[in-house]
Amino acid sequence: MEQPKGWTWQDRAEGSIRRGTALDPSLEPVDGILAFPTAYLPQRLLITRSEEDQEAYDQELRTLRDAADTFGWQLEIESDTGRARELTPGVPGFLRAYLTTPDEPIRRESPVAPDAWRVLQRARRMSRSTMPRTSLEHVLSIDPVGLNPFTRTNPFTRTNPFTRTNPIRGAGAGGSDDYLAPGRGARQPVSWLGPAPQRGPAPKRGRRPVVAVLDTGCGMHSWLPDDIVTRHVELDGVPVGLTDDADPERYPDLYGQLDGEIDAVSGHGTFIAGIVRQVAPDADILSVRVAGALGVIDESSLLLAVAQVVELLRRHREDPSTGFPIDVLNLSLGYSHETPTDGLFSLTLYALLAKARALGCVVVCSAGNDAIDRPSFPASLWAWPGADNGIRADHDAPHVSVGALNPSAHSVALFSNVGPWVQTYAPGAAVVSTSPAFVGGEQAATRADLDGLRRETLDPDDYRGGFAVWSGTSFAAPYVAGRIAAELGTVPIEGVSADAAAKAVAAVAKTLPAPRDRG
């Protein structure tokens, strides 16, 4: 199976190294702060910084260093980078703080490994404040069914949790794991018999709507040529998103065992782009790769990519000859925050998405696949009924959170997250869309050639036909994003108003099923 040039066993073995750790809320409890499990990087913190509150930033940094010192750890701030400045006008930048152990034990004993959660909680106790500028650096995951391991009790007990494409065989497994079985919603090849989406002529006035997809990139497919999908964009000469050779839309088996098994999210971005293409054939697509084949993303990396995309949008709104037009932003990824109430969470992602919406861009997020009602970020970053997140309603372009429906459209998929923060539901189970022409290591169960003909049963991971079935709220979100783009139709060169965006969202919402318990 093809590999990137220079790919070594060290690169492949990286897939067995867990990214992040599970938060234990019982450590360093602080009165008034109710915490829940999440996944985070134990050696890093994110600190918001703006020129207007430099004194408060300096004080918070001193407190963090004092808190780290009580454990025998050191806290170092990364050298000043573009992240320290405004990410886009009106959104403060941030710096990453690294926790390390000293070269020489300070108290004649070797300290335990650094833990950002314990430092943050102790700093809160020492300062008698919530430390509003400081947050953990969370680990986000892409959202096909079977990949969100962070909300389970023991999320890291398997050495390679991400490398099993179809782990369930035979009869249905029961519960939400039933969707992991071939023929029950798991990824598998399928034949497409209809015509390709038909694209109309370019508008004489205005332009086509643009859907931006921040995901694993977009592979090559006859439905997704370069005049429809932009796969590379720069901001001030700097590429937006990941550009390394480890492209999961080109190389299907980068991590884990040398068995040819397709990585769990390889092809994920191509599948999403194909959904947008089906429901909005006249739309253009901007594909930004923010995740690799393991399907996980560091929060700071996502923040930077979102900031770049929002800045491109802002510049285009000010001067259509610059930047890049974006009318709908699709985010099929998420995480659960440890303190999601009363504004005790990192506001940077919310501020960036709010900025995009203020510029007339609709934000569409997948709800997640944990089969729970716990609010997921960024899907729940809006003023939903009964919300205690401190977010106020506004009149900007809408923020839309999307759960998944079963093929019947009469029931919500069991794996889909639910709750008052999920605004709508759309097809997300056993969905058909585009796939790169991957050929995995599994073979047909039976082969019997005759008269020069190759005869065999279905090869479970041969995607050379270009299409697949797959499940996840990941795929419900782009359905809605594409429908909104199609409803917008031809748009002004500079973009649409927030009012026009809201009307398009409302029109689409009226046509989506509203499943209810009918007894």
Model-inferred region functions:
Residues 130-132, 208-210, 281-284, 324-328, ...:
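Loop/turn elements at helix/coil->beta-strand transitions in domains of secreted/extracellular proteins
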Residues 211-213, 286-288, 327-332, 362-365, ...:
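Structural recognition of the beta-strand scaffold that forms the well-ordered cores
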Residues 235-240, 244-245, 381-489:
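Extracellular S/T/G-rich loop segment that most often corresponds to the catalytic His/Ser-adjacent loop
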Residues 291-392, 461-478, 513:
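Substrate-binding/access-modulating region of protease and related hydrolase catalytic domains
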Residues 155-167, 175-283, 304, 308-325, ...:
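Active-site core segment of subtilase-fold serine proteases
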